[in-house]
């Protein structure tokens, strides 16, 4: 794009780093400045819970996902105070003029329980991992992906002391993702691992002094700094188009983009929600194309979740409908699969130790960019 000399990136997690890498790969030679309060080398977040007692801090650069120094990104080690549009429609990040701003601030965990641990940063994970061995019990509020991963990590660590309790105020394990369809599967794993599961029960107030409390009850897009009028989705994320351009009144805000967990892409009648690693990984390609005026990727990848729990490699691709019962299969190469279809069309697939089936579903569910 003509006149594009300085791009600001707010956040240096996976989505922000990939946006910088894709801009350079597409030929951008101008100035890149990034803001992030976490003053350390960018790292991958999923291992913080999956590998709570193992190699939980894995730098993105070591995985080939992007090295900010090597990409020539100047990093300001503080949170962006604001992103604003001037009366002349010029963008400023913390008072610094930029030609385009990419918002990649992710989603911050809910913090509503006094004294509870959350796992969002490497420091959060380190504090929790250090506290657990000295406790009599670990009480986890929330049976979503984070809560079940932490339960798995603690139960599988072979620690002699703490018992693990998993409390969920709804009646389902991973209810937001599966609407009750996987309760029997996960309950079997949890109970076999010795986890005490309490469904339909919020964690009661008042805790034993020797109990560790973990809040894993969801998150919200981290956008308090944004001083630009923009459309929001039901979960509070920024609404974008397929090129990650932030929308206001249904039209793109010039120069403003949002990637990863803080953004949901509106694709006709479908919404591709943030909150998933693969969206953070892939959004930068579309952003770079939009900023530089080059063709974007032909396909938009579907929503995808990966998890390692109770000795199993788990993958979910697509969005599970609440009104369709899954078909269960056992592929010839092993593992198991749950498939959601409507009128012969695949909507979502859950694989347990069946990566080949997941790969096929991923290809079937991608959307051609309109």
Could you tell me what each predicted segment is?
Residues 3-5, 222, 262-356:
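Mid-to-C-terminal Rossmann-like scaffold of FAD/NAD(P)H-dependent oxidoreductases
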Residues 33, 74-76, 117, 167, ...:
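General small-molecule cofactor/ligand-binding pocket signal
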Residues 2-8, 63-139, 201-204, 214-216, ...:
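FAD-binding core/adjacent interface of flavoenzyme oxidoreductases
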Residues 137, 146-201, 301-306:
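Rossmann-like dinucleotide-binding cores of NAD(P)H-dependent redox enzymes
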Residues 355-369:
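A short, polar/charged loop-to-alpha-helix boundary motif
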Residues 115-136, 207-280:
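FAD-site-proximal beta/loop scaffold in flavoenzymes
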Residues 11-14, 141-146:
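Glycine-rich Rossmann-fold phosphate-binding loop(s) that bind the pyrophosphate
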Residues 2-73, 153-177:
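Beta1-alpha1 glycine-rich phosphate/pyrophosphate-binding loop at the start
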